[in-house]
C-alpha cells in the first residue's frame, strides 16, 4: 500500500550559481561526502547536485515530515546501483522515522530537461 508520494523540481541554474560562488559550506551541509565526490566528478555537476537535492526534498514530502523531527540533509543519500538506477539510502533519523511509519520500500525516479531537475519518491508499506 502506498504511504506517501513526493515530487520536487529544481532549477539547475541555482546549483550552477552555488558552484561558481564556491559555496562549499552549503554543499557540505546538504550532501554526503560520497554525493559530493560523485557530482564533482561529472561534467554537468550542477545537474547532478540539483537532482540529488530534489530527491531529498521529495523524500521529505512523501514522508510528511519536511526537514524537522531531527532529520538532517545527510540522513538521506542518493546512490546508483550497478546499472545506474538511482536509489535513496536512509540513515539515522530518516531511517528511524521510515521504520516507525512501518514503511518497507522507497522508490525514486529522477529526470532533467529544459534547465530543471525533477525527482519523485513513492513510499510503500
Curated annotation (Swiss-Prot):
Any single biological process term in GO: fatty acid biosynthetic process
Keywords, alphabetical: Cytoplasm, Fatty acid biosynthesis, Fatty acid metabolism, Lipid biosynthesis, Lipid metabolism, Magnesium, Metal-binding, Transferase
Segments traversing the membrane: none
Pfam families membership: ACPS
Known catalytic reactions: apo-[ACP] + CoA = holo-[ACP] + adenosine 3',5'-bisphosphate + H(+)
Cleavable signal peptide: none
One annotated GO molecular function: holo-[acyl-carrier-protein] synthase activity
Role: Transfers the 4'-phosphopantetheine moiety from coenzyme A to a Ser of acyl-carrier-protein.
Protein name: Holo-[acyl-carrier-protein] synthase
Annotated source species: Geobacter sp. (strain M21)
